[in-house]
Amino acid sequence: MRIGLISDTHDRLPTINAALTLFQQLDIDTLLHPGDIIAPFAAKPLAAFPGTVYVTYGNNDGERLGLSKVLPQIKDGPLHVELGGKRILLHHFRDWCRTADVALADIIVTGHTHEVTIERVEDKLFVNPGECCGWVTGRCTVAILDLDAEHVEVLEIPA
């Protein structure tokens, strides 16, 4: 099973739409977004995605009521999800992940830093797909996570 990872979209509709189109072209039907969508208008393309979207709030998601109206499934992290036989922990910032939550997960997906990170620590895979918005690093990135192989492919979206 392959799932899409997208984070820190920060209201940048062109790259959000490009990422979602790419995921559909690659037959990805499940997305994980660990937060920082920002405004409800930027959540609308995620709500329209023709698959399942798991999403947590980020530190810049101030308009929580509006976001929850567009994406009723949005949650405070940590969010535990089981997909393809893997236990996944979704949270905006890695440093906010409690040891007890990490212990329950095989894969930990975070955002916040805007930097791509793929790191194995003992038997845990930590992944940050970077920033879809490209505002901080100049790179608009998303990732594909192959759950069977626990392999991550980072993809760059044209700005």
Annotate each language-model stretch with its function.
Residues 25, 77-84, 103, 120-122, ...:
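Binuclear metal-dependent phosphoesterase catalytic core
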Residues 78-119:
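Internal catalytic-core helix/loop-beta-alpha segment
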